[in-house]
Design a protein with these regions (language model features):
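Nucleotide/phosphate-binding catalytic cleft detector across ATP-hydrolyzing
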Residues: 1-4, 58-145, 166, 170-171, ...
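Glycine-rich phosphate-binding loop plus the immediately following alpha-helix
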Residues: 120-145, 162-213
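Active-site nucleophile and cofactor-binding loops and adjacent substrate-binding regions
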Residues: 83, 122-131, 149-153, 267-275
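Glycine-rich phosphate-binding loops at beta-strand->alpha-helix junctions
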Residues: 240-259
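Glycine-rich phosphate-binding/hydrolytic loop that grips phosphoryl groups
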Residues: 257-258, 264-300
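Adenine-nucleotide phosphate-binding core of ATP-dependent small-molecule kinases
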Residues: 196-240
């Protein structure tokens, strides 16, 4: 039995490879009940689980898929950064760590990752659950060259060639999401004037700040996501690849039609369990002896 854990913006999702699923809203998670919730919600006993594929926050403190017992500070450089801290993901991580259940921690994509050197310009590219989502595409859609765009509270895109992650464009860099987005000129002025912190500016930098109609919001999301995807196609061309397009996130189905029109191709929408399932698949393959997952080394 293998479990994957997707530390999402709104909820933490758990999935097994035999399609057991559990979603816990981050605001409702209490560390003392996590193990019970997992066992009851997934109908299993943790003592019989071979390995858990765990994700947490930015994942910028590690570069390898690492045995949880070897990880310090939950695999991050520092607490805080881009996004609102709630504590649910921390409770899940700590509960699993204290339970002594065997677990690996997935890294995020950042400037110390094994990616194209040009994509290391920005300090952070994608959180660890995007690695799980990419592995899901590689494993279950059998695609070796693709671009993954996750459109939800924020928008993050990731490029893969020959089953290796080449780099990612983080939520704070380019396309906005529904609630979060990059800092524009006005946001920088607001931060400099003391009106808000940079994190607050990012956390409120999505399309909701514009009070758009649903039609205009979808149109804007689709356009910016398409531009971000096209930017990563430029990277793939350097590797003689043309990537298939996969969409994740809560807004994926809503933007698909317009996004496909912009790109002149058809994308595939992934469901909300794909990242957790991909993390479980990584756990299974690491358990089976894999030393490299999509260009990321394993230290198990």
């Amino acid at each position: 039995m293998f479990i994957g854990v997707d530390h999402g913006t709104q909820a933490v999702r758990f999935a097994t490879l035999d399609k057991r699923k559990l979603e816990l809203p981050r605001e409702n998670i209490v560390e003392s009940s996590v193990v019970h919730d997992m066992e009851e919600g997934l109908n299993l006993k943790l003592e019989f689980v071979k390995l858990i594929g765990l994700t947490y926050s930015m994942g910028d403190g590690i570069t390898k898929i690492t045995n949880a017992k070897k990880v310090r500070n939950r695999g991050i450089k520092a607490v805080g950064g881009a996004g609102r801290y709630i504590g649910g993901g921390t409770a899940v991580y700590d509960a699993i760590h204290k339970s002594d259940a065997p677990a690996i921690v997935l890294p995020g994509i950042h400037d110390e990752s094994n990616v194209d050197f040009r994509m290391k310009f920005f300090s952070h590219g994608a959180s660890p659950e995007k690695v799980g989502l990419a592995y899901y595409v590689s494993k279950y859609h059998k695609d070796r060259d693709f671009i993954l765009c996750d459109v939800s509270s924020n928008t993050v895109s990731l490029a893969v060639a020959e089953s290796r992650i080449l780099g990612a464009i983080d939520a704070a860099i380019f396309a906005p999401g529904v609630t979060q987005g990059p800092l524009d000129l006005q946001a920088i002025r607001d931060v400099d004037s003391g009106l808000m912190t940079a994190n607050e500016a990012f956390s409120s930098g999505g399309l909701l700040k514009r009070s758009l109609s649903e039609h205009d919001m979808i149109a804007t999301l689709a356009l910016h996501a398409a531009m971000e995807i096209n930017a990563l196609q430029v990277l793939l061309r350097d590797y003689s690849a043309q990537g298939s397009i996969f969409l994740g996130g809560s807004a994926a189905a809503k933007v698909k039609v317009l996004l496909d029109e912009h790109l002149g191709t058809s994308s595939t929408v992934l469901d909300q369990w794909s990242a957790a399932t991909g993390c479980a698949a990584i756990a299974k393959d690491v358990w089976g002896g894999a030393l490299d997952i999509m260009g990321i080394q394993v230290d198990f």
